[in-house]
Regions:
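A glycine-biased structural micro-motif
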Residues: 223-228, 295-309
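A short, sequence-level motif marking secondary-structure junctions
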Residues: 150-152, 165-168, 197-205, 246-248, ...
């Protein structure tokens, strides 16, 4: 109405209609019509034809409604000229040094094989494994840990304890995060000396089946005092450090957060501050890559993240580092198209 009235009033009011012809909704329609296992070039051909049909249908409806526009010369994002112009524009951005390649964790749908925007994520209840894992303190840092807790020495092995509902992300662990301002206790127990947030310690010991009389607090300190103390990775031959991050909460868990920069935004942000690598062992199909280190109980390579969960639990149990394992029902992000659980994955 506005375009028509301004044109009739003598103004130059050109309207060039256009259509965004790309996106997962079109691919999803083709998948529903033709199945998931067709070749990529055929998918693109079918998507182009489907988009063209929709353009013509909508164009007829707009013309019938009396919309005044250049209907013989619309812009289409799938037009080869438009795509070529986009590449030229990106080339200019690249030449000016405004573009760089990096990794960042995003919502990832295993069925779409693609990243999802926040608006494409729905939350539904899901049952997940919830585990408490002990990270052994590196023997070369035992003295440093003792000093942090005001002790002259440790009487035995000590462990930083994390709680997670995504065991499959442990192969990508690069650190354990503590809150710099939280109070942490070193508690001697039959399972070793455990580092736990003071506010959560009682609930944790109860969860591990340790009687209150069996747990003796031998020292306390702020999380900041634990910064850069080295730990042994639970099942890989490498070390990870305790680092400080304000994303750590005392609402649940142990007050220490398993940190995998490839699989979480908070992990990525704190990891970037500490210069941690963003090592992503999971492919876009949700399966572990071929170079993923094997566990003593079996191979992770080629397994989906969901199939990896029980293997990781078996490995931790075999090494005596699984303090507690249970199932919980919680709200979890799902793909709005496939209604299937998604993951965070660096890409």
């Amino acid at each position: 109405i506005i375009v028509r009235s301004r044109t009739l009033a003598g103004f130059d009011a050109p309207y060039v209609p256009g259509w965004d012809c790309h996106g997962l909704p079109i691919e999803h329609q083709i998948e529903k019509l033709h199945g998931k296992h067709i070749a990529g070039d055929q998918v693109r051909e079918l998507c182009r034809a489907f988009a063209g049909e929709q353009v013509e249908r909508q164009k007829k409806d707009f013309i019938r409604l009396g919309v005044l526009g250049e209907w013989d010369n619309p812009y289409l994002t799938m037009a080869f000229k438009t795509e070529a112009d986009e590449i030229r524009a990106v080339g200019k951005i690249l030449e000016k040094g405004y573009l760089y390649q990096g990794l960042k964790p995003v919502n990832w749908c295993l069925d779409c094989g693609s990243a999802l925007a926040e608006a494409e994520v729905e939350y539904e209840d899901k049952t997940s494994p919830a585990i408490d894992v002990a990270f052994p303190v590196h023997e070369n840092h035992a003295e440093k840990l003792a000093k942090a807790f005001g002790l002259t020495h440790l009487r035995g092995p000590a462990f930083a304890v994390i709680w997670t509902t995504t065991p499959w992300t442990l192969p990508a662990n690069e650190a354990v995060s503590v809150h710099p301002e939280f109070d942490y206790d070193l508690i001697e127990t039959p399972k070793g000396a455990l580092i736990l947030a003071h506010e959560l310690a009682e609930a944790c010991l109860k969860r591990y089946g340790i009687e209150q009389s069996e747990g003796a607090v031998v020292g306390s300190c702020k999380g900041a005092a634990l910064d850069q103390i080295l730990l042994r990775h639970p099942f890989q031959a490498r070390d990870v450090a305790i680092i400080c991050g304000t994303h750590v909460t005392s609402e649940a868990g142990t007050g220490q957060v398993h940190t995998a920069p490839a699989h979480g935004v908070d992990d990525y942000v704190v990891g970037k501050r500490y210069g941690l690598p963003v090592n992503n062992p999971v492919g876009d199909d949700g399966k572990f890559l071929g170079n993923t280190p094997a566990l003593s109980v079996g191979e992770l390579a080629g397994k989906t993240v969901w199939d990896a969960n029980p293997l990781v639990l078996q490995e931790l149990e075999a090494k005596g580092l699984l303090l507690k394992g249970e199932k919980i029902r919680h709200s979890y992000p799902h793909c709005w198209r496939h209604k299937t659980p998604i993951i965070f994955r660096a890409t």
